[in-house]
UniProtKB/Swiss-Prot annotation:
Role: Binds directly to 23S rRNA. The L1 stalk is quite mobile in the ribosome, and is involved in E site tRNA release.
GO molecular function: rRNA binding; structural constituent of ribosome; tRNA binding
Summary of subunit composition and partner proteins: Part of the 50S ribosomal subunit.
Native species: Cellvibrio japonicus (strain Ueda107)
Entry's Gene Ontology BP terms: regulation of translation; translation
Record key words, sorted: Repressor, Ribonucleoprotein, Ribosomal protein, RNA-binding, rRNA-binding, Translation regulation, tRNA-binding
Family: Belongs to the universal ribosomal protein uL1 family.
Gene3D superfamilies, per database record: 3.30.190.20, 3.40.50.790
Superkingdom per UniProt: Bacteria
Protein name: Large ribosomal subunit protein uL1
Pfam family, one: Ribosomal_L1
Length: 231
């Protein structure tokens, strides 16, 4: 049997897998167990009572976290004219049309979010096989296809989380860094859950938010007592 690391022993000793933790207790424990040399991301996994195989039960959208996500987000925008200048002024790192598409086709992918104005989708549509598998294809449901590219850029820079229910009805997302104050992580999680509740499909029956689990990059998953959240 492989020897357990000091971190693994601490997790085994302090984590009760059968327990639901209040959000405050969960964050405190994750902070206590975080001893790596980088700022771990705090991730949330939410099990929804949906069947994502049914077209009327897809859950997809975006939430702007009130305290950001602690990441330096690089943005590419497909647009032209005055919109292009406005996107640059808002902080977008890459702005263009056909020339930007050519760079992406050539393998230049140094960005985290892609935004497009509606008139640019004729160009972006050619990149589906490149952007789609990476989860970067602009979509109106996530606010990344919009005539208001300035707001979209600002939201992306502010730490907007895009979510989409995967197989099994599970949503994954980062809600900040372990170095964040507990109240900031709590309010970020509450913002995400609030938007998920608004996105509940009408055909979804029974319990919608089945399980909420909080974890860090290298840490354990802790099931959250949803009554400890103000949503």
């Amino acid at each position: 049997m492989a020897k357990l690391t000091k971190r693994q022993r601490a997790i085994n000793e302090k984590v009760d897998g059968s327990k639901q933790y209040s959000i405050d207790d969960a964050v405190a424990l994750l902070k206590e167990l975080s001893n790596v040399k980088f700022a771990e991301t705090v991730d949330v996994s939410i099990n929804l009572g949906i069947d994502p195989r049914k077209s009327d039960q897809s859950v997809r959208g975006a939430t702007t976290l009130p305290h950001g996500n602690g990441k330096d987000v690089r943005v590419a925008v497909f647009t032209q004219g005055a919109n292009a200048e406005a996107a640059k002024a808002a902080g977008a790192e890459f702005v263009g049309m056909d020339e930007l598409a050519a760079e992406i086709k050539a393998g230049k992918m140094d960005f985290d979010v892609v935004i497009a104005s509606p008139d640019a989708m004729r160009v972006v549509g050619q990149l589906g096989q490149v952007l789609g598998p990476r989860g970067l294809m602009p979509n109106p449901k996530t606010g990344t296809v919009t005539p208001d590219v300035v707001t979209a850029v600002k939201n992306a820079k502010a730490g907007q989380v895009r979510y989409r229910a995967e197989k099994g009805g599970i949503i994954h997302g980062g809600i900040g860094k372990i170095s964040f104050e507990t109240v900031a992580l709590k309010e970020n999680l509450e913002a995400l859950i609030s938007d998920l509740k608004k996105a509940k499909p009408a055909s979804s029956k029974g319990v919608y938010l089945k399980k909420v689990t909080l974890s860090t990059t290298m840490g354990p998953g802790l099931v959250i007592d949803q009554s400890s959240l103000a949503v």
